[in-house]
C-alpha cells in the first residue's frame, strides 16, 4: 500500500469512529430526555410531598437516584399571615411576680466585651421578646467609657438583643440612632423612634419595618424626648408621648398617633397632669394607660389614658396615697387625683410604672424615698381612683442595700393566654455617680412577670463587684 492509500485509510477510519461517537452521544441524550419526562410523568413516585406550614419556610431534602436523575433541595415558602395587634383581653390576675430574665451585664463585662448602656427596656413581638437599651458606643473596659455618665452624645444608639443575653458588639441589632427612644410592634412590623441632635434643636426619626419613614423637628427647642420604654399599638395605631421643654417647669407634651410609622394625629396634652416625662405604657381591653414622671412638682405619678381608636386621651394623677416617685415625702393620709403632691429631695424624679386594674392594681417604687436604691412591688387595690387606697400585698424585688434605677412596663401581647400578663423590668445602675472609682455609668437588667401563685421574695440585684474593675 503506497503512502497516499495509507493516508486515505486512516482518514476513513477516523471519520467512521467520529460518526459512531456522535451517534452514541445522540442516543445518550435522547435516553436521558426520555427518562427525565418519564420521571416527571410519575409524581407519586419521585416528587416529594411538601408540607406547607404557617411559619416562614419549609426545606425538604429528597435525594432520589433513578437513571442518574437527582432531585434535591426543594424549597417552598409560605408567608405567615400577620394582622394588627388587637388589645381585646383584660390584664391577668396577679398575686406575685416571678423571674423572667436577668442579663448580668456588669458581672459579665468585667471579663468580656459588654456595651455601656442605660435607659433599658423590654419589648415583644410575635416571635418573642427582646431587650433594648441606649448604647454609649463603647464597652465597659474601653477607654471611651470615661464620661458615659452624660445622657446625650452623637455616639448613642437604640440597640436590641436576645432576651437574657448581655449586650455586646457581636449580638446586638441597631434599631435607630439617638439618645432617647421608644419602640413597639403593631403585629405586622416594628416601629422605633430615636431622638438625636443638640439640646436646642433635637429631632426624632421614626423607623418602621427597618426603614426611616417620618422625621419630627423640635417644637420647643429644649431637649425633645420620649418614653424610654415600649409604646403600645392597637389595631395599627401606635400612640407615643413626647415632651419638649423644661424639666423643672411647664413643658410642651404631645401625644402623637402613628400608623406604620406615619403621623395620623397630634394632640396637645389635655387634663390635669402638669408635667410629663418618660411614660411607661401598657394596653388592655381596648385602652392604653401610660404612667409617667412629673419631674417638676409631683411625687405622685401622672396617668394618661389613651383611646387609640378615637385618637383621644385624658390625664390625671394616680389617686392613691402610696407615692411612687423618687425622691418623695412620706406617704400622706390622702392622695390626690387632680394635682401633684410635692415634697422630697434631692432628686426630682425617676422613670416608673404601675398596672391599674381595680382590685388587681400594682405599683412599683424604690424602697428608699431619697435615692434610687432597692425596689418593691405593692398591691394597692383601686389605686387609680381611691385617694385612701393602701397596700394589701408586698414583694421585694431589689433589697435596699443595692442600687436600682429606671423601671417600666411591658407585656407579651402574643402569648397564648386568655389575658395579658403584666411584666416589668428594673434598671440596675452601676458606676458613676454613686460608684466613682470607675469611669463609666452603665446598667444590667432584671425582668419579672405576674403570677397567680403567691411566690416568695428574693433580691435580684446586679451583683457585680466594682473593685474587680479597678
Curated annotation (Swiss-Prot):
Per UniProt, activity regulation is: Inhibited by the neuraminidase inhibitors zanamivir (Relenza) and oseltamivir (Tamiflu). These drugs interfere with the release of progeny virus from infected cells and are effective against all influenza strains. Resistance to neuraminidase inhibitors is quite rare.
The record lists Ca(2+) as bound by 294, 298, 325
Q: Which positions bind substrate?
A: 118, 152, 277-278, 293, 372
Q: Mind listing the UniProt keywords for this protein, alphabetically?
A: Calcium, Disulfide bond, Glycoprotein, Glycosidase, Host cell membrane, Host membrane, Hydrolase, Membrane, Metal-binding, Signal-anchor, Transmembrane, Transmembrane helix, Virion
Q: Modified after translation how?
A: N-glycosylated.
Catalytic residue positions: 151, 406
Reactions the enzyme catalyzes: Hydrolysis of alpha-(2->3)-, alpha-(2->6)-, alpha-(2->8)- glycosidic linkages of terminal sialic acid residues in oligosaccharides, glycoproteins, glycolipids, colominic acid and synthetic substrates
Topological domain ranges for the Intravirion compartment? 1-6
- Name the glycosylated positions: 51, 54, 62, 67, 70, 86, 146, 201, 402
Cystines in this chain: 92-419, 124-129, 184-231, 233-238, 279-292, 281-290, 319-337, 423-449
Q: Which Pfam families match?
A: Neur
Q: Which residues cross the membrane?
A: 7-27
Topology versus the membrane: Single-pass type II membrane protein
- Look up the record and report any one GO term of the cellular component aspect: membrane
Q: What InterPro entries does this protein's entry cite?
A: Glyco_hydro_34, Sialidase_sf
Which parts of the sequence are annotated with region: Involved in apical transport and lipid raft association? Answer: 11-33
Q: Which GO terms describe its biological process?
A: carbohydrate metabolic process; viral budding from plasma membrane
Q: What else is known?
A: The influenza A genome consist of 8 RNA segments. Genetic variation of hemagglutinin and/or neuraminidase genes results in the emergence of new influenza strains. The mechanism of variation can be the result of point mutations or the result of genetic reassortment between segments of two different strains.
What is its biological role? Catalyzes the removal of terminal sialic acid residues from viral and cellular glycoconjugates. Cleaves off the terminal sialic acids on the glycosylated HA during virus budding to facilitate virus release. Additionally helps virus spread through the circulation by further removing sialic acids from the cell surface. These cleavages prevent self-aggregation and ensure the efficient spread of the progeny virus from cell to cell. Otherwise, infection would be limited to one round of replication.
What HAMAP family does this protein map onto?
INFV_NRAM (MF_04071)
What the record says about family reads:
Belongs to the glycosyl hydrolase 34 family.
Subunit notes for this chain?
A: Homotetramer.
| Name under which the protein is recorded | Neuraminidase
Upper taxonomic classification of the species? Answer: Viruses, Riboviria, Orthornavirae, Negarnaviricota, Polyploviricotina
Amino acid at each position: 500500500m503506497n503512502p497516499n492509500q495509507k493516508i486515505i485509510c486512516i482518514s476513513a477510519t477516523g471519520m467512521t469512529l467520529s460518526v459512531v461517537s456522535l451517534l452514541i452521544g445522540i442516543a445518550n441524550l435522547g435516553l436521558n430526555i426520555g427518562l427525565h419526562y418519564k420521571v416527571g410523568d410519575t409524581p407519586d413516585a419521585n416528587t416529594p410531598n411538601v408540607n406547607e406550614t404557617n411559619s416562614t419556610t419549609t426545606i425538604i431534602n429528597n435525594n432520589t437516584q433513578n437513571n442518574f436523575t437527582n432531585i434535591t433541595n426543594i424549597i417552598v415558602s409560605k408567608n405567615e399571615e400577620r394582622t394588627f395587634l388587637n388589645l381585646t383581653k383584660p390584664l391577668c390576675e396577679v398575686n406575685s411576680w416571678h423571674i423572667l430574665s436577668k442579663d448580668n451585664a456588669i458581672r459579665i463585662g468585667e471579663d468580656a466585651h459588654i456595651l455601656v448602656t442605660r435607659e433599658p427596656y423590654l419589648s415583644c413581638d410575635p416571635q418573642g421578646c427582646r431587650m433594648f437599651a441606649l448604647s454609649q458606643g463603647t464597652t465597659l473596659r474601653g477607654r471611651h467609657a470615661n464620661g458615659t455618665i452624660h445622657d446625650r452624645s452623637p455616639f448613642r444608639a437604640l440597640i436590641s438583643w436576645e432576651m437574657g443575653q448581655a449586650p455586646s458588639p457581636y449580638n446586638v441589632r441597631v434599631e435607630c440612632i439617638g439618645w432617647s427612644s421608644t419602640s413597639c410592634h403593631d403585629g405586622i412590623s416594628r416601629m422605633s423612634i430615636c431622638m438625636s441632635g443638640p439640646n436646642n434643636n433635637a429631632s426624632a426619626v421614626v423607623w418602621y419595618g427597618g426603614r426611616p419613614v417620618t422625621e419630627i423637628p423640635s417644637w420647643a427647642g429644649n431637649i425633645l424626648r420620649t418614653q424610654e420604654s415600649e409604646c403600645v399599638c392597637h389595631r395599627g395605631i401606635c400612640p407615643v408621648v413626647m415632651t419638649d421643654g423644661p424639666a423643672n417647669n411647664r413643658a410642651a407634651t404631645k401625644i402623637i398617633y402613628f400608623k406604620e410609622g406615619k403621623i395620623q394625629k397630634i394632640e396637645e396634652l389635655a387634663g390635669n397632669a402638669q408635667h410629663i416625662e418618660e411614660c411607661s405604657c401598657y394596653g388592655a381591653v381596648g385602652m392604653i394607660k401610660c404612667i409617667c414622671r412629673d419631674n417638676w412638682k409631683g411625687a405622685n405619678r401622672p396617668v394618661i389614658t389613651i383611646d387609640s381608636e378615637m385618637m383621644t386621651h385624658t390625664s390625671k394623677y394616680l389617686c392613691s396615697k402610696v407615692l411612687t416617685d423618687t425622691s418623695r415625702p412620706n406617704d400622706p393620709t390622702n392622695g390626690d387625683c387632680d394635682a401633684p403632691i410635692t415634697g422630697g429631695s434631692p432628686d426630682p424624679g425617676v422613670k416608673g410604672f404601675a398596672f391599674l386594674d381595680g382590685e388587681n392594681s400594682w405599683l412599683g417604687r424604690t424602697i428608699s424615698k431619697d435615692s434610687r436604691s432597692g425596689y418593691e412591688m405593692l398591691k394597692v387595690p383601686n389605686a387609680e381612683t381611691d385617694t385612701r387606697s393602701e397596700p394589701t400585698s408586698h414583694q421585694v424585688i431589689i433589697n435596699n442595700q443595692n442600687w436600682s434605677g429606671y423601671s417600666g412596663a411591658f407585656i407579651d401581647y402574643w402569648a397564648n393566654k386568655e389575658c395579658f400578663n403584666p411584666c416589668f423590668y428594673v434598671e440596675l445602675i452601676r458606676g458613676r455617680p454613686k460608684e466613682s472609682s470607675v469611669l463609666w455609668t452603665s446598667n444590667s437588667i432584671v425582668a419579672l412577670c405576674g403570677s397567680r401563685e403567691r411566690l416568695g421574695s428574693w433580691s435580684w440585684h446586679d451583683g457585680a463587684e466594682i473593685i474587680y474593675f479597678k
